[in-house]
């Protein structure tokens, strides 16, 4: 899993039946300070009603995502699993 920031919505009027009624969002990894890591955006399935600008926890592993969906053949491997309200990090 990793932290990411939601950068945008993806509108899809036709998609695989196991993905219907679920939002697709564009996310980019961030570090613990909230700074973007790299320039690569990813598409993530959203089940928790995240929005643009939200900091989220993303699972990127096909079997875990398919288990959450309850559908072992779902064509997805990246999913938003939590909205992050706060990070409390202890400095060494």
Regions found by a protein language model. Name each.
Residues 34-41:
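Short, structured beta-strand/loop micro-motifs enriched in basic residues and often containing a Trp
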Residues 18-27:
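Short aromatic-glycine-enriched beta-strand elements
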Residues 57-59, 63-92:
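C-terminal structural segments of small proteins and small subunits
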């Amino acid at each position: 899993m990793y932290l990411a920031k939601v950068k945008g919505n993806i509108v899809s009027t036709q998609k695989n039946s196991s993905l219907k009624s679920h939002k697709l969002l564009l996310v980019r990894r961030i570090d613990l300070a909230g700074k973007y890591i790299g320039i690569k955006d990813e598409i993530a399935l959203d089940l928790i009603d995240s929005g643009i600008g939200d900091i989220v926890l993303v699972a990127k592993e096909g079997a875990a995502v398919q288990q959450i969906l309850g559908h072992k053949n779902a064509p997805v491997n990246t999913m938003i699993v939590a909205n992050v309200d706060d990070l409390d990090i202890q400095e060494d």
